[in-house]
Swiss-Prot record:
Coiled coil: none annotated. Transmembrane segments: none annotated. Forms oligomers. Pfam families: MraZ. The gene is mraZ. This is Transcriptional regulator MraZ. GO terms for molecular function: DNA-binding transcription factor activity; transcription cis-regulatory region binding. HAMAP family: MraZ.
Length: 144
């Protein structure tokens, strides 16, 4: 599971060092794809394959939204293996989509990671901070 917030730097070659505590979970390969809010999602390869299988099953049952999502997901996904220093190289398209420059934020999202531009993350946090309590009540109801 992935929890926490980290602030790695993107180097001039587009490489990002993954937080050390996540490297073992991602050593078998990972999939980087566009996510919501102009961020990137990083999934362990095995879990990504399971997710694709579920979406593919829905797409084969004639769900046009699932087919469109699967098509876009496949086109925007890049397979990566961390190097010996725990770095991955983000494609120019992914860097452009997420507006990544030098300062980045990596957040744990329970079963995957998100990569954000540091300024975009700060703005997102400020925008949603006062709604956090109401959103948790609505989304989680009696669980909490």
């Amino acid at each position: 599971m992935f929890f926490g917030t980290y602030t790695p730097k993107l180097d001039d070659k587009g490489r990002l060092t993954l937080p050390a505590k996540f490297r073992d979970a991602l050593a078998g390969g990972l999939m980087v794809t566009k996510s919501q809010d102009h961020s990137l999602a990083v999934h362990p390869r095995a879990e990504f394959e399971e997710m694709i299988a579920e979406i593919s099953a829905k797409a084969k049952r004639g769900n046009p939204q699932a087919r469109a999502y699967l098509r876009n997901l496949a086109a925007s996904t890049d397979e990566q293996y961390p190097d010996a220093q725990g770095r991955i190289t983000l494609s120019p398209e992914h860097r452009r989509y997420a507006n990544l420059t030098k300062d980045c934020v990596v957040t744990g999202s329970i079963d995957f990671l998100e990569i954000w531009d540091a300024q975009a993350w700060q703005e997102y946090q400020e925008l949603h901070e006062e709604n956090f309590s109401a959103a948790s009540d609505e989304a989680l109801g009696d669980i909490l």
